[in-house]
A protein has these predicted regions:
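Charge-dense, helix-prone N-terminal extensions
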Residues: 1-110
Length: 110
């Protein structure tokens, strides 16, 4: 696993609130943090992060500088890509984790 991805994964683990239980699952050549069977975030090899904000959260996330998540030429609805700069400090990363948790906690458990 790349150093940037592992460092970001460690920060995600440290910043998730204690009450939040997430499982870690290998996906996208990375570690995806899963909440109740739904993907929350996934740190990527270049230090960027896949984040699940939901369709309703897309416009706000894009306005804040996120990009549409594209996998093999297809956009992933409800998911955005956060550049490494967007999650560089713990306050920013924590804010994005909270946004993702607010959405993912509305989804049915899988």
């Amino acid at each position: 696993m790349s150093m940037a991805r592992e460092e970001l994964a460690e920060r995600v683990r440290a910043l998730l609130p204690p009450r939040v239980h997430c499982l870690e699952k290998r996906m996208f050549g990375s570690i995806a943090f899963m909440r109740n069977g739904n993907m929350l975030v996934a740190p990527l090899k270049d230090g960027s992060m896949l984040a699940r904000v939901g369709k309703e959260g897309m416009d706000d996330a894009l306005a804040r500088g996120a990009s549409i998540m594209d996998m093999n030429g297809r956009s992933m609805s409800g998911f955005v890509l956060l550049s490494g700069d967007m999650v560089e400090d713990d306050d920013a990363l924590s804010e994005w984790l909270q946004r993702c948790l607010l959405f993912v906690d509305t989804l049915p458990q899988k």
